[in-house]
Amino acid sequence: MKKMNVVAFVTLIISFLLLSQVLAELSSSSNNETSSVSQTNDENQTAAFKRTYHHRPRINCGHACARRCSKTSRKKVCHRACGSCCAKCQCVPPGTSGNTASCPCYASIRTHGNKLKCP
């Protein structure tokens, strides 16, 4: 009697594992079908599957701000402002002043008093 209970239990476990495998395969195949349908459905929807992010490369803000603030009379203030702007924008315009067209993010940051923040 005990041997029959063990055999029944093992059979039950094996059938449960097989059933769960079949269900996993079915859900996997249905996901593939819906994703392939949605990929070919519309041009705009395919962009969701092919997202590419264009991040600016990380720059050495300390070096870039040292170059930018080299001719200022208030170096600590310039370095602090330039460093926070560089960390946010990942760019610093060339030269010691001006040239903000090369980095529009850097040129558009303003203080609470609506003054340009970045030197």
Curated annotation (Swiss-Prot):
Say which species the protein is native to. Answer: Arabidopsis thaliana (Mouse-ear cress)
Endpoints of the signal sequence:
1-24
Function of this protein? Answer: Gibberellin-regulated protein that may function in hormonal controlled steps of development such as seed germination, flowering and seed maturation.
Task: Please state which protein family the record places this protein in.
Answer: Belongs to the GASA family.
Q: Which Pfam families match?
A: GASA
Q: Does the keyword Disulfide bond apply?
A: yes
Q: Which GO terms describe its biological process?
A: gibberellic acid mediated signaling pathway
Keyword set, alphabetical order: Disulfide bond, Gibberellin signaling pathway, Secreted, Signal
Q: Which GO terms describe its cellular component?
A: extracellular region
UniProt PTM comment: Six disulfide bonds may be present.
In which domain of life is the source organism classified? Eukaryota
Write down what this protein is called.
Gibberellin-regulated protein 9
* Subcellular localization(s) per the UniProt record: Secreted
Main subcellular location of this protein, as a coarse class: secreted
